[in-house]
Amino acid sequence: MLTGSPVTKEHEPVIITIRGHTPEVHPESWVAPNATLIGRVRLAARASVWYAVTLRAEAEPIDIGAGTNIQDGVTVHVDPEYPVRVGAGVTVGHNAVLHGCTIEDGALIGMGAIVLNGAVVGAGSTVAAGALIPQGVVVPPRSLVAGVPGRVRRELSDAEVMANRDNAAVYERLVELHREAI
């Protein structure tokens, strides 16, 4: 049962309290005006949630780490006993789906990728665009995963792991452009 109504001010995201839980948005984070945050959502400093994103946490929490970017059209959802934890410096590409999973620090989830309940994507890993990480699969750190179902193709180089971090830093800088525009 919803216990509050959405906040729908112009140029403000939709924030919905559910079961007494209101999303917690760190003052240094940024949420696009048409994003929707529901329930037990927590955003750390410098996290960014872009346009048309839904973070829906009525059963378990969604924690988004510092400097992480959740790009346009992403859906993040939980199930009972399956929270979502996204580490620091993570990039979640456009239209990806994170469902009841853990994404460790510095990972990159490609556009349109799907990560299902209980899956863990290791630190510094890249999940290719359109890949599917099935329920319960654990991806080792620094792995490149591609395919449906996703399979580890190889270990990432130091340069590739750094490129993932650099991508997250680019989005931290883009936030200022969008804050000024709105």
Residue ranges and their predicted role:
Residues T36, T68, T91:
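Ser/Thr-centric signal marking residues that sit
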Residues L2-E24, E58, I62-A66, D72-V74, ...:
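Glycine-rich hexapeptide-repeat left-handed beta-helix
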Residues H11-V49:
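N-terminal segments that cap or nucleate solenoid repeat domains
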